[in-house]
A protein has these predicted regions:
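Glycosyltransferase donor-sugar binding loop
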Residues: 110, 134-149, 166
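Acidic donor-binding loop of glycosyltransferase active sites
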Residues: 175-192, 204
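Donor nucleotide-sugar binding/catalytic pocket of nucleotide-sugar-dependent glycosyltransferases
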Residues: 49-88
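Conserved acidic donor-binding segment of nucleotide-sugar-dependent glycosyltransferases
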Residues: 220-221, 225-232, 239-246
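A short, well-ordered alpha-helix in the C-terminal region of glycosyltransferases
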Residues: 96, 157, 247-261
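Conserved donor-binding/catalytic core segment of Leloir-type glycosyltransferases
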Residues: 101-117, 123-127, 136
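Nucleotide-activated donor-binding/catalytic signature segment of Leloir-type glycosyltransferases, i.e.
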Residues: 148-174
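A short helix/loop element that forms part of the nucleotide-sugar donor recognition site in Leloir-type
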Residues: 86-100
């Protein structure tokens, strides 16, 4: 699996040695990193030329791959469901463990905290929402959390924002996703997101900005809302809409339908057909 150029020297060496004996297929999460540097594209091209084929999981990554390596042979398949973290637990119990109130509308920001993920926008949006809305921030910070803490301290919603700025173990994941009522992805840029696949496993509605593959993975199947622009106001308005009766009435069934489509078996069949097709 490839997502950053740091891996290229090792991956390219292995691929170059292995391609004489077997087909080399690379799963690409990001062909170009979210925070690119001048050497990312040439290094990615170096690796891709050593491979027979590729798996991509979004239109954005497919586009980047074809720009970097026009002759690439690939299949495209959505990110399958992450269902290995354990089952959903009782919401009251999950909230008790996190010290939050189960009767509130609990929003979850989950995963590694990086600038491009727009947590600052979500913190600002919380100040525009009423006291029914609480925010859980769960994940390690890539760098200092100080700038986010400053925003939280200055926010009228500071008592409704609960910070768990730390590594979240696999065993803890069911607690956070079971306590939440919605996952929020306020990203400034994206391709696809593994967190979306986790949210599906826990039947969690989602709200995102209009970046990456979120229109295909959230808006198109009707499992949440993609707001029209990247701003705190758009996030706040979208969050309020997500909790309207009309949205709450339709989203659960749409999530169930999408979960059935996001199987690892589907990806396996596509991959085997790709290998056996003679195209690579």
């Amino acid at each position: 699996a490839y997502w950053k150029s740091f891996f290229v020297p090792g991956y390219a060496h292995v691929a170059n040695r292995m391609k004489k004996h077997c087909k080399v297929i690379t799963l690409i999460h990001n062909a170009i990193p979210h925070e690119p540097r001048f050497f990312d594209k040439p290094l990615a091209s170096l690796l891709f030329k050593q491979c027979h084929g590729f798996i991509v999981m979004s239109d954005n990554v497919r586009y980047d791959l074809r720009k970097l390596y026009p002759g690439a042979k690939y299949i495209q398949n959505p990110h399958p469901l992450y269902n290995h973290f354990g089952s959903k637990i009782n919401k009251n119990e999950a909230c008790r463990k996190l010290g939050i109130h189960p009767s509130k509308k609990n929003l979850l920001f989950f995963g590694l905290i990086r600038d491009y993920k727009g947590l600052d926008l979500l913190i600002e949006a919380m100040g525009q929402l009423n006291e029914d809305y609480h925010l859980i921030i769960a994940g390690e910070c890539y760098g200092s959390f100080e700038k986010y803490q400053t925003l939280i301290d200055a926010s009228p919603a500071k008592k409704r924002i609960f910070v768990h700025c730390e590594y979240i173990s696999d065993e803890e994941i069911p607690i956070y996703f079971s306590a939440a009522d919605a996952l929020v992805l306020p990203y400034r840029s994206a391709t696809q997101s593994g967190v979306v696949s986790v949210a599906y496993n826990y039947d969690l509605p989602m709200l995102s900005t209009p970046v990456g593959d979120f229109k295909n993975s959230i808006e198109k199947p009707g499992t949440g809302i993609v707001v029209p622009e990247i701003s705190a106001t758009a996030l706040a308005q979208g969050i309020e809409e997500l909790f309207t009766p009309s949205q709450q009435a339709t989203i659960p069934a749409n999530i169930s339908k999408e979960k059935a489509a996001l199987s690892w078996e589907t990806l396996t069949r596509k991959l085997l057909d790709f290998i056996n097709s003679g195209f690579i």
